[in-house]
Amino acid sequence: MQVKESLRGLSPYQPGKSIEEVKRQYGLPEIIKLASNENPYGSSPSAKAAIAAELDRLAVYPDGCARTLREKVAKHLGVKETQLLFGNGSDEVVQILCRAFLEPGANTVMAAPTFPQYRHNAIIERAEVREVPLVDGRHDLEAMLAVIDENTRIVWICNPNNPTGTYVNDTELRAFLDRVPRHVLVVVDEAYYEYATAPDYPQTVPLLNEYEQLVVMRTFSKAYGLAALRVGYGVASEMLIRAVEPAREPFNTSTIAQAAAAAALDDQAFIRACVERNRAELERYYRFCEENGLKYYPSQTNFLFIDFGLDGDEVFRYLLERGVIVRSGQALGLPTGVRVTVGTKEQNDRVLELVSQLLREKQLA
């Protein structure tokens, strides 16, 4: 048997180490996991109650149109219900768009490093991947424009960007959209939208009225704390959604996921509280880095990339052996640092204690 050529040599996504895996490996009773940009404060109590209310319906297929969730998201965003595409996480929305637009002979443009699933799915569809290096951790929009041609189908903008946490501002995004050829789909991935507090962070959903080739992606996995349930969505013109819907699998979001997401969306007080606490803790990391001469990218997310000037794997292992899981920059295309999810105050206390210890041992402090 032979798999198709585009899969040969293609590695599956490598998630961070699980808590149980690290406990077993190092014999540690407690682990702090700050590797996957999950919400350290969990999810809304309303979402948990909504899950419990659906437990007697597990034998029944979910609503394939996600009607209740669709109504709530449409109202929340101020768009039509027919402008929404739901996925089993925003990962699946990426997959659907690649399935719908990419093929041999086509190309797709993205930053490097950025969220890896854009590249991964493009390779599976046998499209050419054109990666444009970040400049100071930010998208180089001019260079991205320069590599677009008549065969370009999709341009990806992860905003804020993963793994750097940097963002494209409103003026920059509008200028970019004005210059992108109309045959090119522009996907703005806003997985961390709720965490972005910069005054000039773009409000992209209203731009759908001006740019028919624009798609905005969001997720319930990050600020809403529903990563285990896998719910994400894309927002675009009605025409574009109609065109790509055939590429979506039926029943792709579960009943409990739809119910939890709908309830979570109603609890914006929970989101505001999480964002406020995240921003306060992020400021603590900034002060620590500045006091200790560590470089970092100012972040509009719930994570921070810190450049230690050391092998990222070494920093990763040092923290791992002491019960803290972060993400090595070696796996992210930024080899001299680590990406740290901003945890609770207590979790961050432990991280900063260990990093201080590491800096003393390396005589870097």
UniProtKB/Swiss-Prot annotation:
UniProt keyword annotations, A-Z: Amino-acid biosynthesis, Aminotransferase, Histidine biosynthesis, Pyridoxal phosphate, Transferase
Keyword check for Transferase: yes
Keyword Nucleus: no
Obligatory cofactor(s): pyridoxal 5'-phosphate
HAMAP family cross-referenced by the UniProt entry: HisC_aminotrans_2
Reactions accelerated catalytically: L-histidinol phosphate + 2-oxoglutarate = 3-(imidazol-4-yl)-2-oxopropyl phosphate + L-glutamate
Organism ancestry: Bacteria, Bacillati, Bacillota, Bacilli, Bacillales
Matching InterPro entries: Aminotrans_II_pyridoxalP_BS, Aminotransferase_I/II_large, HisP_aminotrans, HistidinolP_aminotransfase, PyrdxlP-dep_Trfase, PyrdxlP-dep_Trfase_major, PyrdxlP-dep_Trfase_small
Domain of life: Bacteria
Pfam families: Aminotran_1_2
Signal sequence segment: none
Residues bearing PTM N6-(pyridoxal phosphate)lysine: K222
Pathway: Amino-acid biosynthesis; L-histidine biosynthesis; L-histidine from 5-phospho-alpha-D-ribose 1-diphosphate: step 7/9
Residue stretches spanning the membrane: none
UniProt-listed PROSITE patterns: AA_TRANSFER_CLASS_2
Protein family per UniProt: Belongs to the class-II pyridoxal-phosphate-dependent aminotransferase family. Histidinol-phosphate aminotransferase subfamily.
PANTHER family named among the record's database cross-references: HISTIDINOL-PHOSPHATE AMINOTRANSFERASE, HISTIDINOL-PHOSPHATE AMINOTRANSFERASE 2
Molecular function terms from GO: histidinol-phosphate transaminase activity; pyridoxal phosphate binding
Entry's Gene Ontology BP terms: L-histidine biosynthetic process
The protein's name: Histidinol-phosphate aminotransferase
EC numbers: 2.6.1.9
Subunit structure: Homodimer.
EC class name: transferase
